[in-house]
Amino acid sequence: MAQNDTVINGWQPVIGLEVHVQLLTNTKLFSPAKNKFGEDANSLVDLIDMGLPGVLPVLNEGAMNQGIKFGLATSAKIAETMIFDRKNYFYPDLPKGYQITQLHYPIVKDGIVDLGYKKVRIHQAHLEEDAGKSMHDQYDANSVIDLNRSGVPLLEIVSEPDIRSASEAVDYLKKIHQIITYLDISDGNMSQGSMRCDANVSIMRPDAKEFGTRAEIKNINQFLMMTMDTRLLNWILQGPRKAHWSIADIGCHITYKRVPNTYERGLYYCWNNFYSNSYN
């Protein structure tokens, strides 16, 4: 059993997790293309996934129902209105130039994950489409793109910053994995990318009332999480602070966030409401 609070050299880690779960639907979130792992590159791509002009997305009802199941399993509030947003940014593996996601009206809000020794609050869980996959190791001088993953339905589960140690974070991830596999909404296969995790981390004095500067660690796994406590102090206590760190020895990327909420609103990020009332 993990300790509820872990203070290291007078500092208290504060951790919030964003878990991306690929849902077990037959087709993608907004297109009729099949949702299946391991097929030949670009063999499961629809016109919608390619972002061609004139195509219109239709929401996958099965993905919506699976999101609702997760919300019920975590005693969360279920949205009565389905509203989606466009998150605009520029990646080679995102042909549309934006990702369809939920910002203002997520399908799930205010859930609870019970670890036995403490409860971790879920801020929200929202539906969004996955991006394609860029591969840089196939050819010496060129990168290639596989759009099979483009449009695959994701449920992004965002916790509140209630986690206070790496071992608590691992317990939380194991509990999320247990829930999604028991509900049969995802296979939770981390090696295939069915369950991916980003961590928002900071440190504070135990008697402080405000959190410290937040850093985001992308694409971590349980083995890295187990050593986060000591690495966290090394990263954040170094000075001066950097906006971006590439940590080659642990294979992840750290980005300091200087915005007041979960969503980055930098030069390449803006939001436009995208409404859908179709559940077919």
Each model region followed by its residue ranges:
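Basic, nucleic-acid-interacting segments
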Residues: 2-262, 278-280
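Intrinsic low-complexity, disordered N-terminal segments enriched in polar/charged/small residues
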Residues: 273-277
